[in-house]
């Protein structure tokens, strides 16, 4: 087996024009809007509500939501760029964005029924903050360690949990 250096010279991993534009836009936001309030928010455990209001003006809160629900989907590289630029300046804001996009919006878009999609996705695309909660006695927030299960009751009217919730 012989490896060719031609392959190395011909492979280019460059950002597209759209990806570069998103990087510059998010970098400008992160460097301008987030720094003045980071220490105060962190010290006082205050969520970045005002900063989020400014962030949604860019329309990036809907990147995991299909267009028919008001979103503006981007590729995975763009999503990574947004997270990278936010986390460079304010990791907690980046986590808030990740939860909104990945754990909330994307989960509903992929696994929600039509009623859930119509109810939640337009609101999330418009800027309402998405959230996610997971806790179990003995497992905390470690999803892999969860043992609690929900089973539909025999009459189909409710679910029965077989463990403890915190």
Residue ranges of predicted features:
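Short secondary-structure transition/capping segments
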Residues: 75-78, 107, 144-145
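Amphipathic, small/basic residue-rich leader segments at the start of a protein or domain
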Residues: 2-98, 115-119, 123
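N-terminal glycine-rich flavin-associated loop
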Residues: 95-115, 140-142, 155
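Flexible loop residues that form catalytic
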Residues: 68, 101, 137
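A generic secondary-structure signal for well-formed alpha-helical elements
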Residues: 33-34, 111, 128
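Glycine-rich, Trp-frequent "lid" loop and neighboring beta-strands that shape
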Residues: 71-72, 115-166
């Amino acid at each position: 087996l012989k490896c060719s250096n031609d392959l190395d010279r011909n492979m280019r991993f460059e950002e597209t024009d759209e990806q570069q534009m998103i990087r510059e836009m998010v970098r400008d936001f992160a460097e301008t809007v987030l720094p003045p309030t980071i220490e105060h928010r962190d010290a006082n455990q205050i969520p970045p509500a005002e900063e989020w209001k400014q962030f949604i003006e860019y329309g990036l809160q809907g990147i995991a939501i299909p267009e028919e629900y008001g979103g503006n989907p981007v590729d995975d590289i763009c999503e990574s760029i947004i997270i990278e630029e936010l986390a460079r300046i304010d990791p907690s804001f980046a986590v808030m964005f990740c939860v909104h996009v990945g754990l909330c919006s994307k989960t509903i878009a992929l696994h929600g029924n039509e009623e859930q999609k119509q109810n939640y996705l337009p609101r999330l695309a418009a800027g309402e903050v998405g959230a996610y909660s997971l806790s179990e006695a003995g497992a905390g927030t470690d999803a892999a360690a969860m043992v609690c299960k929900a089973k539909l009751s025999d009459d189909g009217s409710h679910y029965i949990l077989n463990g403890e919730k915190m």
